[in-house]
């Protein structure tokens, strides 16, 4: 089986939902699927230099290949005429395409090319069909859907959702297309010798202070307006902890600056470390150091950062708008609550006051994630879905 993965960018600056295509491709390759990723060299939306990669020819890694094409960005909208020309010429060599992202010109155009070339394709929305997400730039998206994405959804072989909740709430624009509900996978972080201690020493975090970690994009939907006041209240009530804010937002630097200023003008400032974007050994070390992971998002179609924390053995405190909240609750992998400040005061406080329970829920989280969020298990589910589509 030969499969194309099409995505606007796989740069690390776009976070887990884009990076997951790398894990998926590797998992599929291990199951003897021939995989080609086609993408652009986009590397951020605020004037960053493009990725330093070879363009227009295959780069082989981990059993699959990636072909990068020059991106012609307009603000955060990505387009590549070279990618589309390549797709039109080579679509006939593949059995199926898996297209990631809606409301992105390069993905939308790729869907039309696939349809014209009679290549079956699956669309993964990445949360863009969530009503909360559709409210952003509402009029533009309504027009875009009416003239472009509605037809793309109708012509798709299936829509790939990553949770039952995402499938349940997503807008379909009147289209009836088959759903695939298959979660994302995570790769367990490599152990860094004394990584947790080194991180604490590097940033002057007391060894006896529980480390509360937020590791995600600094975005308005992530609920930092709930988390920061909740942590302030916990400080007022004499709870001992150190907060680490790990993330950035190349698409909205003004909001990132606002959050940093809010913390700088708060009692939290002497109990907080702001790291910026982290990856590699530093990210793995932070996950080793963390005692609790928090994500009070207003909406999250899956929550890849939560799954990464779970597979690292960290108990999680999340909102019931992170769409894997039921798995977290049922597996006793952490605490789940409503998007309210007082709820997070209560849940984080309960976790901090019960270190043994915290540790047990971390073990539960790791066990669950290794079983259900491993790329090998997910790749097999996706291959079965591909085969079902191709035999219809």
Predicted features and spans:
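Short hydrophobic beta-strand element within catalytic cores of glycosyltransferases
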Residues: 315-319
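Donor nucleotide-sugar binding/catalytic pocket of nucleotide-sugar-dependent glycosyltransferases
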Residues: 39, 145-196, 205-207, 274
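Aromatic "clamp/platform" in nucleotide-sugar-dependent glycosyltransferases that forms part
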Residues: 298
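A short helix/loop element that forms part of the nucleotide-sugar donor recognition site in Leloir-type
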Residues: 49-57, 191-205, 258-259
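Glycosyltransferase donor-sugar binding loop
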Residues: 43-44, 186, 215, 242-258, ...
């Amino acid at each position: 089986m030969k499969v194309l993965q099409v995505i606007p960018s796989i740069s690390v600056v776009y976070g887990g939902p884009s990076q997951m295509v790398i894990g998926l491709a590797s998992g599929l390759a291990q199951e003897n699927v021939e995989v080609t990723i086609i993408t652009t060299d986009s590397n951020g939306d605020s004037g960053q230099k493009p990725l330093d990669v070879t363009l227009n020819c295959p780069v082989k890694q981990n059993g699959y290949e990636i072909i990068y094409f020059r991106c012609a960005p307009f603000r955060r909208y990505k387009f590549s005429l070279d990618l589309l020309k390549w797709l039109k010429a080579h679509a006939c060599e593949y059995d199926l395409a898996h297209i990631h992202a809606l409301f992105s010109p390069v993905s939308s155009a790729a869907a039309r090319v696939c349809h014209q070339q009679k290549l079956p394709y699956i669309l993964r929305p990445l949360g863009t069909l969530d009503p909360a997400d559709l409210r952003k730039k509402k009029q533009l998206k309504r027009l875009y859907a009416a003239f472009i994405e509605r037809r793309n959804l109708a012509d798709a072989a299936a829509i790939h959702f990553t949770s039952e909740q995402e499938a349940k709430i997503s807008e379909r624009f009147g289209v009836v297309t088959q759903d695939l509900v298959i979660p994302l996978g995570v790769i367990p972080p490599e152990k860094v010798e004394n990584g947790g201690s080194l991180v604490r020493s590097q940033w002057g975090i007391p060894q006896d202070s529980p480390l509360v970690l937020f590791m995600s994009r600094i975005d308005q939907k992530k609920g930092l307006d709930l988390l920061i006041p909740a942590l302030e209240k916990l400080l007022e009530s004499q709870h001992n902890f150190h907060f680490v804010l790990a993330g950035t937002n190349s698409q909205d630097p003004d909001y990132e600056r606002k959050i940093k200023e809010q913390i700088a003008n708060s009692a939290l400032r002497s109990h907080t470390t702001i790291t910026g974007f982290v990856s590699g050994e530093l990210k793995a070390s932070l996950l080793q150091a963390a005692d609790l992971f928090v994500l009070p998002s207003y909406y999250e179609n899956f929550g890849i950062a939560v799954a990464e924390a779970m597979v690292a053995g960290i108990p999680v405190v999340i909102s019931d708008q992170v769409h894997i909240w039921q798995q977290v609750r049922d597996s006793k992998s952490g605490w789940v609550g409503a998007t309210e400040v007082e709820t997070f005061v209560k849940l984080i406080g309960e976790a901090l006051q019960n270190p043994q329970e915290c540790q047990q829920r971390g073990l539960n989280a790791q066990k669950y994630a290794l079983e259900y969020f491993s790329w090998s298990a997910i790749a097999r589910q996706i291959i079965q879905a591909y085969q079902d589509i191709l035999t219809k």
